[in-house]
């Protein structure tokens, strides 16, 4: 490896490599959707409605994720609450 090798610009990934990576992300996302229960989107909306009884939040401030392990399933709920000062 010479000095000139260090000065060369790094090559950008080819468009085929970028397309392949994007496709893999889409396929992984679709597979995850197939394994989640049918009731999860409805459950998320009901949780949002209950939270809105007490604070004003947007739909994108609530994240619901279901993780399946060998022995159990874990439902993770993340809510971004507004500042209490306002």
Curated annotation (Swiss-Prot):
One of its GO terms (biological process) is regulation of division septum assembly. Pfam families: MinE. Transmembrane segments: none annotated. Keywords: Cell cycle, Cell division. InterPro entries: MinE, MinE_sf. Coiled coil: none annotated. SUPFAM superfamilies: Cell division protein MinE topological specificity domain (SSF55229). The keyword DNA-binding does not apply. It comes from the Bacteria. Prevents the cell division inhibition by proteins MinC and MinD at internal division sites while permitting inhibition at polar sites. This ensures cell division at the proper site by restricting the formation of a division septum at the midpoint of the long axis of the cell. Belongs to the MinE family. HAMAP family: MinE (MF_00262). This is Cell division topological specificity factor. It comes from Alteromonas mediterranea (strain DSM 17117 / CIP 110805 / LMG 28347 / Deep ecotype).
């Amino acid at each position: 490896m010479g000095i000139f090798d260090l000065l060369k610009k790094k090559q950008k990934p080819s468009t085929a490599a970028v397309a392949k990576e994007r496709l893999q992300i889409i396929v992984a996302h679709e597979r995850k959707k197939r394994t989640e229960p049918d009731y999860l989107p409805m459950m998320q909306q009901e949780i949002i409605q209950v939270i809105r009884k007490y604070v004003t939040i947007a739909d994108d401030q609530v994240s619901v994720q279901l993780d399946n392990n060998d022995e159990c399933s874990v439902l993770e709920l993340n809510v971004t609450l507004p500042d209490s000062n306002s």
